[in-house]
Amino acid sequence: MTHVRDMDEADIEAVSRIRVRGWQAAYAGLVPGTHLDAMTVEDDAARRRQWFSRPGRTSRDLVAVADGRGPVGWLCYGPPPAGAPDPAGSGEVYALYVAPDLIGTGVGRRLLEEAHHRMRAEGFTASALWVLAGNERALRFYERSGYEADGRTQDDVYDEVTLTELRYRRPL
């Protein structure tokens, strides 16, 4: 049985492990291997501790917890980044990762449904997120969850390779 709750500081190591392993599994063949190989749980956890304890942080973190296993998924959401040209009332899912051995078991869906529920309760009327072009599994997942590409793109550079992200949106 898996349930979703707010992330707390004790979850940081598990969330970093989920995020790093998630990147390495989901982005193999898309993001340069040198970048993926350089990722470590320890470095991610150190950055996450700083970020998690930042005063005035407006993002929210959720974890999916499996009985007897601890956190097996993580989602972070909140308002669009400062300066983003989003309509009033829009929120953004910044990240969603599931332990690679549990992808396709409903953990990600439960996290996303809970995030949508909380976003509506916080007054958001729409949700946006960014998906790496070519990440077909993620694109199918978000499309099944009611998201549609809105035509916006942004580029990120990983080890001198430019990759494009596509923005997806859905009403809440």
Feature roles, as predicted:
Residues 106:
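Conserved G/P- and acidic residue-centered "switch" motifs that form tight phosphate/ATP-binding loops
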